[in-house]
């Protein structure tokens, strides 16, 4: 039971450092270092003296870029010339609208939940500080993450919008309001620790880089200890995941973060041999038969 609870904690961290760096020089003569990541496969972080570059790989289209961000340090913004191409985000950010409960939880652990000014899908957010903010009116209800209240988001004028993208996703009017959209695609990583490592990106955004690095190191150590313990366990509990939505039952692919988590936890999962990194759209009858 203790093992399962601890594994759930690690999962929530991202339902919720390598010191190796490669030095380059940009067009403005700044020294830039590529941060070596231990597990994450779909993100690159390049740190320069006055800005950082974060490149998100498209997990659905191999070899293509999903989004490129240029994080400009506010104190240096007036003196920077020749910025590279990409979505400009001034950091540390001072306010945000967050579409997913998992990111609300992570920002709370990073100590920056006070910078959340609006949320979507409030019924799924169980954090006391978020619920109190909604009651007091300091945090706005922006509706559903599928159909957000765009006008309310615009009225809040946040520095960024954090949401989870989908393949060929279009954000409609939200793309036209001039607010940087942070595409949080960490759920498409192929390991739980790869997914968790994206907190380093969010640490850069919110000005809590050291705290994010420290938290990730704790998660990394804890997860691997639990994995070793789980592999030695003699029992292999079976798991049934998710739930029926209409006529479809979505289950994690065997190569997804959840699928890999089940393997690491030594849990018997019906689709563990599947090779997909996303979710599987299955009939309820098929899932029950498995």
Regions found by a protein language model. Name each.
Residues 1-26:
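Bacterial Sec-dependent N-terminal signal peptides
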Residues 19-104, 211-240:
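Bacterial Sec-exported substrate-binding components of ABC uptake systems
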Residues 52, 60-154, 161-166:
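A short, structured surface patch at a secondary-structure boundary
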Residues 55, 63, 280-290:
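Ligand-binding pocket segment of bilobal, Venus flytrap-like solute-binding proteins
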Residues 112, 177-179, 265:
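Short, structured coil segments at secondary-structure junctions
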Residues 138, 149, 155-249, 272-273, ...:
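Extracytoplasmic substrate-binding proteins
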Residues 250-280:
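Alpha-helical, coiled-coil/dimerization segments enriched in small aliphatic residues
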